[in-house]
Curated annotation (Swiss-Prot):
Superkingdom to which the source organism belongs: Bacteria
Annotated residues for binding of Fe cation: 96, 98, 158
PANTHER family assigned to the protein according to its UniProt record, in alphabetical order: PKHD-TYPE HYDROXYLASE YBIX
Name listed for the protein in its UniProt record: PKHD-type hydroxylase YbiX
PROSITE patterns referenced in this protein's UniProt entry, alphabetically: FE2OG_OXY (PS51471)
Length: 225
């Protein structure tokens, strides 16, 4: 399943990020990908050795960790350190699949269940630059407002189309979920959404408490901690 998570960053946060990224050190984006991805990747990334990068990636982690919708959809166990990329002058990233595992500075290795892109450029400011994701439901073309995030299975083939005008800047990361199976995770997300909707409409009740108990028992049964 693919999820649109709006307002992960406020407009003020986005403006501050963009101002700081104007001063960042950018390097060839192929340094963080494998041999297959490097053949189709043509973009730039913020140098992860810089002091500015350390500060910005911490801010992204704080923002996603505080977002209730992100947590409900991803049920994250481990988040990778966020990276930042930039596309301009017809730069693109052809169809590829993300690696199944990635190194993690604290955990050694993590499984990539979900991929996330946090858009930092207004969609009207550039042409092209769509994230195209192929999954079992078809092809999705994604170009979201700055500050919004898209979450999709890392097993999906995806690409970024050439940016023919302007500059597309984004942050991206991977998530190991407590729930490995996409279908089970989607069912828990739907159940959680329905519980919250019923609570807001009718208040607390024995039936809602029973559904909440069901949610947590399923989470207990399926989760890998």
């Amino acid at each position: 399943m693919m999820y649109h998570i709006p307002g992960v960053l406020s407009p003020q946060d986005v403006a501050r990020f963009r101002e700081q990224l104007e001063q960042a050190e950018w390097v060839d984006g192929r340094i963080t990908t494998g041999a297959q991805g490097a053949q189709v990747k043509n973009n730039q990334q913020v140098d992860t050795r810089s002091t500015l990068y350390a500060a910005l990636q911490n801010e992204v982690l704080n923002a996603v960790n505080q977002n209730a919708l992100f947590f409900a959809a991803a049920l994250p166990r481990t988040l990778s350190t966020p990276l930042f990329n930039r596309y301009q002058n017809n730069e693109t990233y052809g169809f590829h699949v993300d690696g199944a595992v990635r190194s993690h500075p604290q955990n050694g290795w993590m499984r990539t269940d979900l991929s996330a892109t946090l858009f930092l450029s207004d969609p009207q400011s550039y042409d092209g630059g769509e994230l195209v994701v192929n999954d079992t439901f078809g092809q999705h073309r994604v170009k979201l407002p700055a500050g919004d995030l898209v979450l999709y299975p890392s097993s999906s083939l995806h690409c970024v189309t050439p940016v023919t005008r302007g500059v597309r800047v984004a942050s991206f990361m991977w998530i190991q979920s407590m729930i490995r199976d996409d279908k089970k995770r989607a069912m828990l997300f739907e159940l959680d959404n329905n519980i919250q909707s019923l609570k807001s409409r009718y208040g607390e009740s024995e039936e809602i408490l029973s559904l909440l108990n069901l949610y947590h028992n399923l989470l207990r049964e399926w989760s890998e901690i």
